[in-house]
Amino acid sequence: MTPRQRLTVLATGLGIFMVFVDVNIVNVALPSIQKVFHTGEQGLQWAVAGYSLGMAAVLMSCALLGDRYGRRRSFVFGVTLFVVSSIVCVLPVSLAVFTVARVIQGLGAAFISVLSLALLSHSFPNPRMKARAISNWMAIGMVGAASAPALGGLMVDGLGWRSVFLVNVPLGAIVWLLTLVGVDESQDPEPTQLDWVGQLTLIPAVALIAYTIIEAPRFDRQSAGFVAALLLAAGVLLWLFVRHEHRAAFPLVDLKLFAEPLYRSVLIVYFVVMSCFFGTLMVITQHFQNVRDLSPLHAGLMMLPVPAGFGVASLLAGRAVNKWGPQLPVLTCLAAMFIGLAIFAISMDHAHPVALVGLTIFGAGAGGCATPLLHLGMTKVDDGRAGMAAGMLNLQRSLGGIFGVAFLGTIVAAWLGAALPNTMADEIPDPIARAIVVDVIVDSANPHAHAAFIGPGHRITAAQEDEIVLAADAVFVSGIKLALGGAAVLLTGAFVLGWTRFPRTPAS
């Protein structure tokens, strides 16, 4: 690599590091944020979900703006938006202001995510060098994602909850400076007109889909009509979008990309990998904090094998693609994710050292998958459509992360709701008291959350506490194992698709 190429990798890598860290780091600060804004669980969840929703809604628009007005200029704009909104997040004005700031932060994250990959692709036209560059970029970013719980726990314990947002200010300044000094500007050589109709149909469609996925765990049978209406509206908007894109002279998304079976397969497998990665991180963090009752810092430290494995595998994946082609690394790493989940599920309730080995293998599998998939996705398009291709890949990551958290979380919640009432029948004979405790535990995803209902004036006595916790812990462990099994099913489908679609030949 030339010195300028190294600066490009560093600048874009640190940018995506900020984005991935903020996906998860705020979870550690939620108890403190809850006290400041005096809000309940639903308000907190939307404060978190606003980031992902804002990011998912505008990814493709960011790609088009970057291709037209300059990818470096748009990247710098995204970094600036991200830093300014991070500052607003620490102002104790109201929960509404905090949530809006998180949405705007997601908008900035969308610019950073899409344009960092597009800038990287432009700076490395050679496929072999591009594979190495993407592997380094992905390693930096995903280490941020997986290390966020530990980093957040350390910062919240030592500096307070505002530090998880204020850290973006100096980091953003470094990214801003490195980009202006070391990254070349690039854009579509034949800039197109802005596809306003495409944006006005795609953005609300993606927002509705993301909203439905985020809210899915809270919907009940009475909400079926509302859910159907949301999905119908999203479907109509997508139909209008596709119809318009077929006719548009300058489309937001070139639908010819999807005519290539390989590109479609890359998007699907990448969606599955990101779903399983982010969904599993959420479930495992929940296990360490809520079931094992570890502190945020201790739980974060237990998660460190995931970024360690991810980072090492990401760095090696580029060389593996150049030597063996994309199929073997992807299939091997999908199998590693499956095996890592199996090891963790078997040992999670009694053998922590073995469970940590499973997390390391899982992280390595995810890191080794991401680089070949991004390499395949970016090499299938010409440089003029690099922003568009990067936007589609980042959209899969964003929606995949939302879907994975909702999918695995729904499995755990459904299992708890079905199994806890029968399991606690002996500990809490009174059906009314039992229903109250079950609702509290399921809503908070915490077997210890029933403590507020124990004591004078309540139907549950303090003597029942140990039995309730033991029973709830056992059901939680079973639910988490079931959720990990759901992730394994998704990985199996991705493995079959990769086996049949991905090329075996190395990059030339």
From Swiss-Prot:
GO terms for molecular function: transmembrane transporter activity. It is a multi-pass membrane protein. The chain crosses the membrane at residues 9-29, 46-66, 75-95, 104-124, 136-156, 163-183, 194-214, 222-242, 265-285, 297-317, 328-348, 354-374, 399-419, 479-499. This is Drug efflux pump JefA. Induction: Induced in the presence of ethambutol or isoniazid. InterPro entries: MFS, MFS_dom, MFS_trans_sf. It is found in: Cell inner membrane. Belongs to the major facilitator superfamily. Involved in resistance to ethambutol and isoniazid. Keywords: Antibiotic resistance, Cell inner membrane, Cell membrane, Membrane, Transmembrane, Transmembrane helix, Transport. GO terms for biological process: response to antibiotic. GO terms for cellular component: membrane; plasma membrane. It comes from the Bacteria. Efflux activity is inhibited by carbonyl cyanide m-chlorophenylhydrazone (CCCP) and verapamil.
